[in-house]
Design a protein with these regions (language model features):
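Iron-sulfur (Fe-S) cluster-binding segments and ferredoxin-like electron-carrier domains
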Residues: 48-59, 71-89
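N-terminal small/glycine-rich loop or linker at the start of catalytic domains
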Residues: 64-72, 193-199
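Catalytic cores of large soluble enzymes that bind and process phosphate-bearing ligands
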Residues: 14, 18, 82, 115
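Flexible, acidic/Gly-rich N-terminal and inter-domain linker regions that tether
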Residues: 1-67
Length: 239
């Protein structure tokens, strides 16, 4: 950490976005409903593959985040007001895409009194109303550790609630803006204690050691996390 120089990617790592029929249709549905996805906001290198298969991770509560985590490419600043039609638009898009499993995430909304919790809950309820056979996985922010706000999401009853630890304890303060390692563990504990499947994710490639990753995994097990994803950090390019 601490080196801002962008590293040129090897040719074998580069992929073509592609533009098959499913990709074009997914793009049309997302844009026609004025929705955001973490795929495009985060400049995800897998967007072509996922959209080409008709899947996308919807990002609610706008596309401007109140935090500025160093690993993330999502825009930071003063967000716009919430769109009251967004929950319905997300649910309609999921129906049009015929998704059997929907994944939703959001920017952080530290500017709102409830940090976006009610909007989260309404989105989940609308998805379930319009898509009763679709399972719902939500990747939530920490809501500043406020249990009553996390409980609003829990009571909407998604099948999986995920909150990413992102990295190991030592590196967390350097890359996670306004987040806290132990607060995140308590968020996951609250999810697990509710009976909903608790999930988390981390990146490797930030300077962590194998022992530190094992320590993090032990911490997650201790609070009841059932699913962990581990990905390789790839720095977004400017274009």
């Amino acid at each position: 950490m601490g080196n801002d120089k962008r590293v040129r990617k090897p040719e074998w790592l580069k992929i073509s976005i592609g533009a098959n029929e499913r990709y074009t249709e997914t793009k049309r549905i997302v844009e026609s409903h004025c929705l955001h996805t973490i795929c495009s906001s985060g400049r995800c290198p897998n967007m072509g593959e996922c959209w080409g298969k008709g899947t996308a991770t919807f990002m609610i509560a706008g596309d401007i985040c109140t935090r500025s985590c160093k690993f993330c490419n999502t825009q930071t600043g003063r967000p716009l007001p919430l769109d009251p039609d967004e929950p319905a638009h997300v649910a309609e898009s999921i129906a049009l895409m015929k998704l059997s499993h929907a994944v939703i995430t959001s920017v952080d909304r530290d500017d709102l009194p409830d940090l976006g919790a009610a909007h989260w809950a309404q989105t989940i309820r609308e998805i379930k109303r319009l898509n009763p056979e679709t399972t719902t996985e939500v990747l939530i922010p920490d809501f500043q550790g406020r249990k009553e706000l996390i409980d609003q999401v829990i009571k909407a009853c998604p099948e999986i609630i995920s909150h990413n630890m992102e990295t190991v304890k030592r590196i967390s303060p350097q890359v996670r803006s306004a987040a806290n390692y132990h607060t995140s563990l308590e968020v996951i504990r609250q999810i697990a204690e509710s009976g909903i499947t608790a999930k988390s994710g981390i990146m490797v490639g930030l300077g962590e050691t194998p022992a530190e990753v094992e320590e993090l995994m032990d911490d997650l097990i201790s609070v009841g996390c059932k699913i962990l994803t581990i990905g390789q950090y790839l720095q977004p390019t400017h274009k």
